[in-house]
Amino acid sequence: MPSDRPFKQRRSFADRCKEVQQIRDQHPSKIPVIIERYKGEKQLPVLDKTKFLVPDHVNMSELVKIIRRRLQLNPTQAFFLLVNQHSMVSVSTPIADIYEQEKDEDGFLYMVYASQETFGF
């Protein structure tokens, strides 16, 4: 079971930077992404892991499908994937473009997921 603490609190900045460098050296066509459940989320389950290496050609709609499948959600369950806890990006946007615009200073791309109700829509 993953820790309740966010990834950034479990690893030092230096360790995260080093890990990204190793990932990018070994897998230059993969984007290092951290996906965690939104802190106030109650309806959606917790993912079995938080770190993903996403092929750079994948777009957001494909990533959403992958995460929905990992969470074993049914088609009617609301699901939102936000970049840096605030940005909803177009589902057609390639993950490589999002990475270039939104990556953290440690080199990871951070995302959170939540159900629609969490944001009061």
Swiss-Prot record:
Record-level Gene Ontology MF annotations: microtubule binding; phosphatidylethanolamine binding; phospholipid binding; ubiquitin protein ligase binding
Post-translational modification note: The precursor molecule is cleaved by ATG4 (ATG4A, ATG4B, ATG4C or ATG4D) to expose the glycine at the C-terminus and form the cytosolic form, LC3-I. The processed form is then activated by APG7L/ATG7, transferred to ATG3 and conjugated to phosphatidylethanolamine (PE) phospholipid to form the membrane-bound form, LC3-II. During non-canonical autophagy, the processed form is conjugated to phosphatidylserine (PS) phospholipid. ATG4 proteins also mediate the delipidation of PE-conjugated forms.
Sites of Phosphoserine modification: S12
Topology with respect to the bilayer: Lipid-anchor
Gene3D superfamilies attached to this UniProt entry: Phosphatidylinositol 3-kinase Catalytic Subunit, Chain A, domain 1
Annotated lipid attachment (Phosphatidylethanolamine amidated glycine): G120
Source species, domain of life: Eukaryota
Localization, UniProt: Cytoplasmic vesicle, Autophagosome membrane; Endomembrane system; Cytoplasm, Cytoskeleton
A GO term from the CC aspect: glutamatergic synapse
Biological source species: Homo sapiens (Human)
Annotated CDD domains: Ubl_ATG8_MAP1LC3A
UniProt name for this protein: Microtubule-associated protein 1 light chain 3 alpha
Assembly and interaction partners: 3 different light chains, LC1 (a cleavage product of MAP1B), LC2 (a cleavage product of MAP1A) and LC3 (produced by one of the MAP1LC3 genes), can associate with the MAP1A or MAP1B heavy chains. Interacts with TP53INP1 and TP53INP2. Directly interacts with SQSTM1; this interaction leads to MAP1LC3A recruitment to inclusion bodies containing polyubiquitinated protein aggregates and to inclusion body degradation by autophagy. Interacts with ATG13. Interacts with ULK1. Interacts with TBC1D5. Found in a complex with UBQLN1 and UBQLN2. Interacts with UBQLN4 (via STI1 1 and 2 domains).
Keywords, comma-separated and alphabetical: Autophagy, Cytoplasm, Cytoplasmic vesicle, Cytoskeleton, Lipoprotein, Membrane, Microtubule, Phosphoprotein, Ubl conjugation pathway
Outcome of swapping K51A: Decreases interaction with ATG13 and strongly reduces autophagosome formation
Family: Belongs to the ATG8 family.
Gene: MAP1LC3A
Residue numbers with lipid attached (Phosphatidylserine amidated glycine): G120
Propeptide position ranges: 121
SUPFAM superfamilies assigned: Ubiquitin-like
Result after altering K49A: Increases interaction with ATG13 and strongly reduces autophagosome formation
Main subcellular location: membrane
Biological process terms in GO annotation: autophagosome assembly; autophagosome maturation; autophagy of mitochondrion; cellular response to amino acid starvation; cellular response to copper ion; cellular response to hydrogen peroxide; cellular response to nitrogen starvation; cellular response to oxygen-glucose deprivation
InterPro entries, A to Z: Atg8-like, Ubiquitin-like_domsf
Effect of K30R: Enhances binding to RETREG1
Protein's job: Ubiquitin-like modifier involved in formation of autophagosomal vacuoles (autophagosomes). While LC3s are involved in elongation of the phagophore membrane, the GABARAP/GATE-16 subfamily is essential for a later stage in autophagosome maturation. Through its interaction with the reticulophagy receptor TEX264, participates in the remodeling of subdomains of the endoplasmic reticulum into autophagosomes upon nutrient stress, which then fuse with lysosomes for endoplasmic reticulum turnover.
Site (Cleavage): G120, F121
